[in-house]
Amino acid sequence: MLILTIETSCDETAAAVVRDGRTVLSSIVATQVKDHAVYGGVVPEIASRKHLESIPVVIDEALRTASVSLDAIEGVAVTQGPGLAGALLVGTAVAKAIAFARRLPIVGVNHIEGHLSAIFLEREVAFPFVALAVSGGHTHLYRVDGIGRYTTLGQTRDDAAGEAFDKVAKLLGLPYPGGVEIDRLAAEGDPASISFPRPLLHDGSFNFSFSGLKTAVLNHVRKNPVQEDGQQLRDLCASFQRAACDVLVTKTLLAAETEGIGRVVVAGGVACNSALRRDMAREAADRGIELAIPSPSLCSDNAAMLAVPGDFYLSRGISDGLSLDALVNWPLDTIRTRLES
């Protein structure tokens, strides 16, 4: 099945053409980083306007790169949520217009389900597995028993990990997007130079909390001002990053061991972080756990990842029709009802 996928949940306008939920013929992403950098974060109104400007061009480019026309498309998958309301509405409106004009089946895909499924565009992973979805808006642990079959094991109680990275970067005066800058500076820093807390590390749950870690960094900077782009800044970034990664790695692998599952998938924008990828790989290998992390281009927001669940649902006759609407909040473990209806 040849499907067109559209992603506009936050600040990336993306479209892709994918065959049979595995073969990516094109994947186009228009970023808005420069538009939001001056504000130090995503401005929802600006994001929506940029989506409106970019989406026709992005879809045309996806079709052109795939060497297909809309006549060849057999279905449409679009990010339905969670995400920014205005941004989601742009994508869903365009997707429904295409589906209506071409009389195509359309299905809404959960943004997090897309991230957890991205790995299947590069390799197969046997079910069940434990998945860490870690990004600017989400830090969740799931047991995944199949497409559409998710059980929440733990989640952040406050800030998402990516949000903590961005907020720490902002208080340090680093450019947006901050997570990338922290990763870059940390590579030349000493992660043992500052002892930051590891919130909830040994509380017996699979939940996360990053607000306390963020506050600890703020208090340290107030007492120990750092020079711009000096070694102290590099050491601070490395120490903060190590603390955050320690919690993510420890909780994820403990969840896998507790569930009796020997496979872990890490997905989402923060999965691009070099320290997280390295530390997770080392610790997983030491425990005999199979680890799968998509390439960085598939960790950040993209439309190709939607094709895995999109094709799964559409090929089984599961679609939403033109009543599909944006869902700002859409818990992943509620998707199971789609398979049961």
From Swiss-Prot:
Keywords: Acyltransferase, Cytoplasm, Iron, Metal-binding, Transferase, tRNA processing
GO biological process: tRNA threonylcarbamoyladenosine modification
Cofactor note: Binds 1 Fe(2+) ion per subunit.
Cofactor section: Fe(2+)
Pfam families: TsaD (PF00814)
Compartment annotation: Cytoplasm
UniProt-listed SUPFAM superfamilies: Actin-like ATPase domain (SSF53067)
Reactions accelerated catalytically: L-threonylcarbamoyladenylate + adenosine(37) in tRNA = N(6)-L-threonylcarbamoyladenosine(37) in tRNA + AMP + H(+)
A cellular component annotation (GO) from this entry: cytoplasm
Binding positions for Fe cation per the UniProt entry: H111, H115, D301
GO molecular function ontology, one term from the record: N(6)-L-threonylcarbamoyladenine synthase activity
Enzyme Commission number: 2.3.1.234
Recorded superkingdom: Bacteria
Residues annotated to bind substrate: A133, V134, S135, G136, G137, D166, G179, D183, N273
Family the entry assigns: Belongs to the KAE1 / TsaD family.
Function: Required for the formation of a threonylcarbamoyl group on adenosine at position 37 (t(6)A37) in tRNAs that read codons beginning with adenine. Is involved in the transfer of the threonylcarbamoyl moiety of threonylcarbamoyl-AMP (TC-AMP) to the N6 group of A37, together with TsaE and TsaB. TsaD likely plays a direct catalytic role in this reaction.
Name recorded for this polypeptide: tRNA N6-adenosine threonylcarbamoyltransferase
